[in-house]
């Protein structure tokens, strides 16, 4: 046996105090983590104030998140800036038609507006057509235009062409033109086997100058005297494509004229002249013979041919071009007489700009049509209706302005037809909508800053939640005043799908009719950007935090059990129990600090994403939840420190070391965490001589004295400490006189 330096051990009173503090801290940690995890599982305060994070959408960029709503909000927001306008006036009127067939076409018209100013002006001007117009007439004309779009492969091109065509027709009607060129052209195209080709031919003829058109007069006269216009066209085509010398032409015409004057036979003359004609000019010679054989007036035909050759039309490039276009018209038509008559009338039109617009418009409409015959039939009916109804004509320019300002003219027009039909049957319900349009027209379009400022009030009026409080198991909605509106039933861990969160809130609000009318689903919400790209980082965070919180709860519970065990004397100085308790304290601390860190990182990721994407959404951490988790970590950290301190002091003071001495009766006295062992088990190991026995007793007294003095140093009433006396008393061990000097540094090592 030998004596070493001995550190003053902690008394049981201090150990119990430390264990009590640790038990209290672990119990508090357990409660804090449970409350933080449960969060707003019950819809009452103060639990509703416990949430992981809160999304604030009062200044959400609606035009970016829901692009279809952007133009609508711009128009309605502009109306709100008008004098004496209020949310009830604007959105109350919209709410009145929410359950009617009018909401869908109205919102579609506004949503498709690429230029809200033009759209508002056009709708305002078209409104009387719906309210006070002739339902049968105005609706029929709109239906006819809608029919054109039905057969269109390119609605934009069709409407552009129709706009040119109708504008030109209206101009012609206002000038009282004696020749309705549009009607002539439509008749030509309806008779054509290839309307597209015929339209191109008419454009070619229309682009000729008046002098170039005059060159065609001999051609028209030849057709006028012809008994077989197909043969006449063939003969003229041959003349246009064959080179004939002027001398030969003059000789031929002179001989023919003499024959006619003398009453001779033209056939004999042609037979006589045939051998004299060069081979290259033979086709032209045969063409002249064909023309004279298929005419009602030989003299007039021969005179016309003479004029045609004298003007050298067969060599004129413009004449060749014009004749080629005329040939196309004849070939595509089953009524060559109508073709000649119509082309001759169109050639007399002096306003080529107007006629060009008509033909270009027709070309656009026909080229974009999937059914040319139906398209031409509808155009004829529309032309007839507009020319006979002056009351509808005044609305045509605004109609095409509306379509021109639309991103989807086809849908816009069909919506206008539907809305007009409904408004004519329900004028009183529709009048407040017209007031909204009038208010919007009377003021400047609302700016982005003004719209952003009034967004909170609009959202509040439509009962759309402003604040979204995310807990682990629940999601709560709050209004502009931070009052809880509702909390969903606790369910599986929140997956932080912001698209679904926002859409579900919209569906349960007064905004639902707008979503249904525009057929907007959750996938239509535009939330692309950094926030969604990092979804794989923050979505698993909530599940991780839940797992860590559960571990913290479990570890806290078992830590409390081991702390209670350490209260008992038989376990107080068992080093393995202290090490297990220490490990559990560390686990609680690690679980809570990781949960707190993960939430902080998740909040930072979401805040960064919403800021960079410029959605106007502000996300911040829940102060109550953050405080609970960090407090739980702080308590577990302090408790861990206390356990480490106590364990280390006990270890350094030898409390965990097994030691023994033999008393006068040969019995073993044990201390530390050793067990009492009978003296006879030691046999030869017992101290046999008196010197050794005296030495052992002295050592035992020193050990007892050291512990006694330690207890006296840590307790104010040494004599009253029954626990210490119980610990130190042992049979046949005589305490050392306390009046003498005490060696507090003596330590026995077996």
From Swiss-Prot:
Glycans are attached at residues 61, 84, 115, 154, 176, 197, 207, 228, 241, 267, 293, 299, 312, 335, 351, 373, 389, 519, 709, 714, 724. The modification Phosphoserine is found at residues 675, 678. Residues 703-750 are annotated as: Disordered. Keywords: Glycoprotein, Isopeptide bond, Mitochondrion, Phosphoprotein, Ubl conjugation. It holds the Pfam family SUR7. N-glycosylated. It is found in: Mitochondrion. Residues 703-726, 736-750 have a biased composition (Polar residues). There is a cross-link at residue 697 (Glycyl lysine isopeptide (Lys-Gly) (interchain with G-Cter in ubiquitin)). Its main location: mitochondrion. GO terms for biological process: fungal-type cell wall organization; long-chain fatty acid transport. One of its GO terms (cellular component) is cell periphery. PANTHER family: CELL MEMBRANE PROTEIN YLR413W-RELATED. This is Uncharacterized protein YKL187C. It comes from Saccharomyces cerevisiae (strain ATCC 204508 / S288c) (Baker's yeast).
């Amino acid at each position: 046996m030998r004596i070493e330096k001995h550190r003053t051990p902690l008394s049981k009173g201090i150990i119990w105090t430390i264990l009590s503090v640790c038990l209290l801290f672990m119990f508090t940690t357990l409660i804090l983590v449970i409350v933080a995890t449960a969060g707003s599982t019950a819809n009452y305060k103060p639990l509703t104030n416990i949430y992981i994070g809160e999304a604030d959408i009062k200044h959400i960029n609606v035009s970016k998140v829901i692009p279809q709503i952007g133009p609508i909000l711009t128009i309605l927001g502009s109306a709100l800036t008008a004098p004496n306008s209020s949310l009830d006036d604007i959105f109350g009127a919209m709410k009145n038609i929410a359950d009617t067939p009018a909401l869908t076409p109205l919102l579609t018209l506004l949503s498709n507006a690429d230029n809200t100013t033009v759209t508002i002006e056009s709708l305002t001007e078209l409104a009387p057509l719906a309210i006070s117009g002739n339902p049968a007439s105005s609706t029929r004309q709109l239906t006819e235009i809608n029919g054109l779009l039905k057969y269109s492969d390119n609605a934009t091109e069709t409407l552009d062409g129709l706009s040119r065509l109708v504008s030109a027709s209206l101009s012609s009607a206002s000038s009282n033109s004696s020749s309705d060129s549009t009607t002539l052209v439509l008749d030509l195209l309806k008779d054509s086997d290839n309307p597209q080709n015929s339209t191109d031919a008419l454009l070619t003829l229309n682009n000729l100058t008046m002098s170039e058109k005059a060159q065609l007069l001999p051609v028209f006269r030849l057709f006028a005297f012809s008994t077989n216009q197909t043969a006449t066209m063939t003969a003229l085509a041959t003349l246009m494509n064959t080179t004939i010398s002027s001398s030969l032409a003059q000789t031929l015409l002179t001989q023919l004229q003499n024959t006619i004057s003398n009453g001779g036979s033209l056939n004999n003359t042609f037979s006589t002249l045939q051998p004299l004609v060069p081979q290259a000019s033979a086709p032209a010679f045969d063409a002249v013979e064909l023309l004279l054989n298929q005419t009602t007036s030989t003299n007039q035909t021969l005179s016309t041919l003479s004029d045609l050759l004298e003007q050298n039309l067969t060599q004129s490039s413009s004449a060749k071009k014009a004749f080629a276009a005329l040939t196309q018209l004849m070939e595509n038509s089953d009524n060559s007489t109508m073709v000649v008559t119509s082309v001759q009338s169109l050639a007399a039109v002096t306003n080529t700009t107007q006629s060009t617009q008509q033909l270009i418009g027709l070309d656009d409409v026909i080229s974009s049509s999937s059914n040319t015959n139906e398209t031409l039939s509808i155009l004829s009916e529309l032309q007839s209706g507009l020319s006979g109804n002056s009351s509808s004509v005044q609305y045509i320019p605004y109609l095409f302005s509306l379509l021109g300002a639309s991103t989807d003219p086809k849908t816009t027009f069909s919506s206008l037809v539907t809305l007009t039909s409904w408004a004519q049957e329900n004028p009183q319900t529709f009048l407040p909508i017209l007031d909204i349009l009038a208010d919007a027209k009377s003021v400047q379009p609302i700016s982005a800053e003004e719209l952003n400022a009034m967004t909170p009030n609009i959202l509040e009026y439509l009962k759309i939640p402003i604040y979204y409080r995310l807990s682990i198991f629940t999601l709560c909605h709050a209004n502009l005043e931070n009052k809880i509106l509702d909390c969903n039933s606790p369910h599986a861990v929140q997956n932080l799908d912001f698209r679904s969160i926002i859409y579900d809130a919209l569906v349960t609000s007064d905004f639902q009719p707008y979503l249904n009318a525009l057929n907007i689903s959750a996938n239509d919400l535009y939330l692309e950007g950094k926030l969604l790209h990092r979804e794989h980082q923050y979505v698993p965070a909530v599940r991780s935090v839940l797992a860590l919180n559960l571990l913290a709860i479990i570890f806290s519970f078992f830590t409390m059990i081991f702390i209670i065990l350490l209260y008992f004397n038989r376990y107080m100085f068992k080093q393995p129990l202290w090490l297990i308790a220490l490990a559990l304290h560390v686990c609680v601390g690690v679980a809570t600090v990781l949960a707190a860190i993960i939430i902080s990182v998740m909040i930072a990721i979401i805040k960064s994403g919403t800021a960079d994407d410029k959605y106007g959404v502000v996300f911040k951490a829940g102060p109550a939840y953050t405080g609970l988790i960090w407090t739980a970590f702080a308590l577990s950290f302090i408790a861990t420190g206390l356990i480490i301190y106590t364990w280390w002091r006990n270890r350094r003071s030898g409390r965990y070391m097994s030691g023994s001495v033999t008393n006068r009766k040969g019995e073993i006295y044990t201390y530390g965490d050793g067990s009492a062992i009978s003296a006879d088990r030691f046999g030869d190991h017992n101290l046999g001589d008196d010197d050794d026995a005296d030495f052992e007793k002295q050592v035992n007294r020193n050990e007892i004295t050291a512990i006694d003095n330690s207890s006296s140093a840590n307790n104010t009433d040494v004599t009253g400490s029954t626990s210490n006396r119980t610990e130190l008393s042992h049979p046949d061990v005589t305490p050392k006189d306390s009046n003498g000097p005490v060696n507090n540094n003596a330590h026995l090592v077996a």
